[in-house]
Design a protein with these regions (language model features):
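Unchanged
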Residues: 1-165
Length: 165
């Protein structure tokens, strides 16, 4: 199943992690001796066969960018698609800082439109867990779950999902 990965790693965390994120993004927080929080999500993507991954960053992103650019642990070579890091930019079209997760994806819509993948897996970059996204995509494909609605929905800060066994 062809999928592209989007990792949301740009939030300012609204102070939920206190001084730990004063000078770095939550996704760049050290875990163990040589890992960062984002490494778990990147490993999940790689182990799920997702070879093209975009990391969307914003606040305090230097440490995260340095880590992503210096590591080749996840096997996102150009032949498989690659690892891309996007930050907000300004252009003649007047782009601004991301105004939330949906806006960060919207501002990078060109990247998605140019991809040939059938599915998009969107995850957080600061959560530590192990998951095979192929199983999630298979469930989505086999279930009666309909695609996300195309009509405009009211903006929300958080999204709640209920998991079924």
């Amino acid at each position: 199943m062809k999928a592209i990965g989007i990792i949301l790693a740009g939030g300012n965390n609204d102070g939920r992690l206190g001084v730990l994120t004063d000078h770095r993004a939550a996704a760049a927080l050290p875990i163990g001796s040589c890992y960062r929080a984002i490494d778990f999500t990147l490993s999940n993507m790689s182990n799920s066969g997702i070879g093209k991954v975009a990391v969307l960053t914003q606040y305090n992103s230097r440490s995260l960018r340095d880590h992503l650019m210096s590591s080749k642990w996840w096997d996102f070579g150009r032949k498989q698609g690659g690892l891309f890091v996007f930050t907000p930019y300004t252009s003649n079209a007047g782009s601004t800082w991301f105004r939330g997760t949906a806006d960060s994806i919207y501002q990078n819509m060109t990247f998605l439109k140019r991809s040939n993948e059938e599915y998009v897996v969107i995850t957080s970059g600061d959560s530590v867990y192990k998951m095979d996204y192929r199983k999630v995509l298979e469930y989505h494909k086999e279930s009666s779950t309909s695609p996300a609605p195309k009509e405009k929905a009211p903006a929300s800060k958080y999204l709640s999902l209920k998991a079924r066994n």
